[in-house]
Amino acid sequence: MTTRYIFVTGGVVSSLGKGIAAASLAAILEARGLNVTIMKLDPYINVDPGTMSPTQHGEVFVTEDGAETDLDLGHYERFIRTKMNRRNNFTTGRIYEEVLRKERRGDYLGATIQVIPHITNAIKERVIAGGEGHDVAIVEIGGTVGDIESLPFLESIRQLGAELGRDRTLFMHLTLVPFLGAAGEIKTKPTQHSVKELRSIGIAPDVLVCRGDRAVPANERAKISLFCNVEERAVISLKDVDSIYKIPALLRSQGLDELVIKRFNIDCKEADLSEWENVIYQEANPNGEVTIGMVGKYIELPDAYKSVNEALKHAGLKNRVTVNIKYIDSQTVEAKGDEVLQGLDGILVPGGFGERGVEGKILAAKFARENKLPYFGICLGMQVALIEFARNVAGMADAHSTEFNPASPFPVVGLITEWIDEDGQLELRHEESDLGGTMRLGAQLCHLKEGTKAAEAYKGNTCVERHRHRYEVNNNYVDRLEKAGLIFSGLSSDRKLVEMIELAEHPWFVAGQFHPEFTSTPRDGHPLFEGFIAASLSHQKRILG
């Protein structure tokens, strides 16, 4: 199979939405029957985003094979059916680590190691490997053209363009076309300068995607075409929209997919975007709304919970309601108590690390349990629910996780001390182990207990979900907690680890050690999120009478 490559770069400013644009183009090409994958090349020195602050970088998206990746890979999976893996995201740090390891082994036979050709060759090899087996591979380059960090990646794709030829490569550049209110007009000069910068390093863009708060008029697109030496039909206007799921149709209406197909000389069917039209219709025509309180510690940056936010929206589509998310700082719950939890239709406690704000999350779980309010706990959200139950129902007053209180007399949650790494080797871990790459990661089979809400949601006795954590329920306390009324509704593939808990005498109190948000999509939703929103809607109706 001959793979074609579309390289996506960004200019003028960051956060233009390269990932959304790349994913939307991929969705159109997939709708034309093509097998598409997407890669993200990140120019930072970190080996992966696993140890980066969520308030700086946003969430860490976990793939099926356990890679800790950029949040853009979440967008990719939500827009196309192809599942991402560790080949779909790599960083400058990963490349340098790989090259330096080879140098230490003597693989370069005494050569002087340089950015060109050794670093660029390593980048090119990964890009080619990531695209294998697909009709089209879209490669997003992180950062902004002009940044010093991006230069090795840009040089690598320049070389690939020359080596593979025009019939197998296409360069798509996103730029900002701002509207100046004082002047009352759109300005194209930033785009012209960005293209000039890109051309100065040897890359001539084939497509320009012009971002702005309004559509770019035909005369301005003609001007951009003239000064940037790009065909006028290849100057695409991408205005702000109220839903990212409208973007595939917006790009298709301007013929972007047709331009790509003709460039690559691919024979394929017309795009069928009916699934996306249905998503847009459901989003625009809700029958009600619910308010979900998300009690977390990274709420100053909503992207820290990007996949959770999207999964709640998807569940809203399936229940035909708008989901309003109220972000609640768990430290505020500690300071003010129940008053900040009033008026909610459901509470969701997402994952997180560290002691800050954990007591607020425990209070949120207690409030939901005592007030029969739908509760959904994810990862740490399950652990705090279990800790709360142990303290206030099972009679273990000082119960805690050893992550937060190693001296707790009732360590109901403890560190995973033995684990199998990605190479199948046994690893021993302790509190002083490295933070990066030392967690239980990736898709794992879970056995569901018959007659539980978990089994009802999944419509079966097993599920497969992705994990990202170091701590697990301490099996020494399972019997005591079970006798107190806690239901262990999900167990690991070997039935040795607790994966899900729930309460019997509660309308909907369900929590999982895994991250179901990573597999939710706008077209398919996710059974647990759908069940949670359905329960929240039912709670609202009961309250309103």
Swiss-Prot record:
Enzyme class at the top of the EC tree: ligase
Protein name: CTP synthase
Additional remark text: CTPSs have evolved a hybrid strategy for distinguishing between UTP and CTP. The overlapping regions of the product feedback inhibitory and substrate sites recognize a common feature in both compounds, the triphosphate moiety. To differentiate isosteric substrate and product pyrimidine rings, an additional pocket far from the expected kinase/ligase catalytic site, specifically recognizes the cytosine and ribose portions of the product inhibitor.
Function recorded in the entry: Catalyzes the ATP-dependent amination of UTP to CTP with either L-glutamine or ammonia as the source of nitrogen. Regulates intracellular CTP levels through interactions with the four ribonucleotide triphosphates.
Gene3D superfamilies: 3.40.50.880, P-loop containing nucleotide triphosphate hydrolases
Upper taxonomic lineage: Bacteria, Pseudomonadati, Pseudomonadota, Gammaproteobacteria, Alteromonadales
Location of the active site: 379 (nucleophile), 515, 517
Region (Amidoligase domain): 1-266
Keyword Metal-binding: yes
Regulation: Allosterically activated by GTP, when glutamine is the substrate; GTP has no effect on the reaction when ammonia is the substrate. The allosteric effector GTP functions by stabilizing the protein conformation that binds the tetrahedral intermediate(s) formed during glutamine hydrolysis. Inhibited by the product CTP, via allosteric rather than competitive inhibition.
Residues of the Glutamine amidotransferase type-1 domain: 291-542
Catalysed conversion reaction: UTP + L-glutamine + ATP + H2O = CTP + L-glutamate + ADP + phosphate + 2 H(+); L-glutamine + H2O = L-glutamate + NH4(+); UTP + NH4(+) + ATP = CTP + ADP + phosphate + 2 H(+)
Positions with a binding annotation for L-glutamine: 352, 380-383, 403, 470
Pfam families: CTP_synth_N, GATase
InterPro entries in the record: Class_I_gatase-like, CTP_synthase, CTP_synthase_N, GATASE, GATase1_CTP_Synthase, P-loop_NTPase
Oligomer and partners: Homotetramer.
Residues binding Mg(2+), per UniProt: 72, 140
A GO biological process held by the record: pyrimidine nucleobase biosynthetic process
Family: Belongs to the CTP synthase family.
Native species: Shewanella denitrificans (strain OS217 / ATCC BAA-1090 / DSM 15013)
Gene this chain is encoded by: pyrG
Record's signal peptide: none
Binding annotation for UTP: 14, 187-192, 223
Residues the entry annotates as binding ATP: 15-20, 72, 239-241
Pathway it works in: Pyrimidine metabolism; CTP biosynthesis via de novo pathway; CTP from UDP: step 2/2
Residues bound to CTP: 14, 147-149, 187-192, 223
Keyword list, A-Z: ATP-binding, Glutamine amidotransferase, Ligase, Magnesium, Metal-binding, Nucleotide-binding, Pyrimidine biosynthesis
GO molecular function per UniProt: ATP binding; CTP synthase activity; glutaminase activity; identical protein binding; metal ion binding
